[in-house]
């Protein structure tokens, strides 16, 4: 009797376990036992900050569409990185000996069998409409949500950003691909990774104007006054200041603070160029740019090229800031706007930007981007592939400038570790932090200035001494909050509060490292111009030269030794100190000194 009873219990237990496992499999759509044998997971589930994002159902998975981007595995990536380090090292005999677009394209182009394997897989799954980029490194297609779920064994949701109300279709599930494709695909965009959202330029807290900053200290700057009043060639910090007494910053005052002489801004080389990147319907207003230039006594100049969509009558604050200040710093340098992606739930604008650049043989020399996210919200496969794209740009002598972010060190919900930002944490971009000019004339690190040490990327050789010195200075404090062997950022800083732009016919003081990045990018364009005039190469990946100059000629920087980036992160943050620190980097550039050593 006992034997029969025990046997029944065992059988019931086996049936129960089998039922549980079947339910687990069914919970992952289309993932049958046969598929498990033939397919392999190619991504890891990402963490979603539920304080920032709301998860909802997609109303109709058959009509809703998603754009999938397949990053095809490229060749010679190790050799590419070695080459980048050599052409970026001022002590190397190959310094500045960049490759052309076509040379890079042929060097790293995926194998034909990799491209064909992915194309055949799509066709086998009744996906016959897709495009392959000129360089062969990306394949893109638009499919229904239902088809994407079937293809990748995932379940999509609608993710709504609680602050901006922007929504995107994404999955929290790791996707699967056929085992035989594992070595042909780096990542698939449009599945897990949420689009990068800008650390939006905010109206500076000291503004006396409402709803767009139309007033400064009671002085109204409406369109009518712009027509009737004389130019404002510079703001006088004694007469025009925010409520807290800190001065508003005009292009002229910013140049003075960074020692940019008038002769330095005279750009003449036709081979020079610069660009800003804009996503999420951040459009450009030629009218705002024209009035901004007139109002501040700047030389009139126009945008030379707009890649992608633009709606003149629907401008964005981010675009106004970026274009007005990159051109204010480098007024005669040919300037592009690369505009990608609207607000469609199925798009990934940052990835669109990368794909567009990877197919363009006439890339501008300097790019300014004011968008980012936490490293922890992004998969390693995605960041590694994006890093490869940055390496390709560096190998061609291009400079990529990112704002370091507007949330200080960032932190997790438990306040027991910092959350570094990305792409600012990449070793192959120049990350720009923020500083504030105070009413007493001092300049300090901005508490919002994104900075810290990467959890993904190891420390590059060009900043080992600087980061090690800072960590030694910490003397063990905060050691559990950050990765002591990670890439340190930012690299350099500029002004991030009370920077005045013109938006929808009104002058408006704004804040954020979104202001810092285009200011620095414009100055790098000036350096490129002077190098090109002397038949020297463009600066490319500037970081190795920048850190070398800081060691050999520290007078090229205004060292910022006060400030802490503990913005909204409990009570912890990094502090500024003499030398490099993860609040302001190497400090504020002393431009006329810096450019001298860039020409040696």
Swiss-Prot record:
Disulfide bonds: 411-570
Peptidase S53 domain segment(s): 248-600
InterPro entries hit by this protein: Peptidase_S8/S53_dom, Peptidase_S8/S53_dom_sf, Peptidase_S8_Ser-AS, S53_propep, Sedolisin_dom, Tripeptidyl-peptidase_I
Cofactors: Ca(2+)
GO process terms (BP): asexual reproduction; macropinocytosis; phagocytosis; proteolysis; response to chloroquine; sorocarp development
Reactions accelerated catalytically: Release of an N-terminal tripeptide from a polypeptide, but also has endopeptidase activity
Matches recorded under PROSITE patterns: SEDOLISIN
Post-translational modification: Activated by autocatalytic proteolytical processing upon acidification. N-glycosylation is required for processing and activity.
Source domain of life: Eukaryota
Compartments where located: Secreted
Proregion positions: 23-220
Pfam families: Peptidase_S8, Pro-kuma_activ
SMART domains according to UniProt: Pro-kuma_activ (SM00944)
Transmembrane segments: none
GO CC terms of this entry: extracellular region; lysosome
The protein's role, per its UniProt record: Serine protease with tripeptidyl-peptidase I activity.
Designated name of the protein: Tripeptidyl-peptidase 1
Gene that this polypeptide is encoded by: tpp1
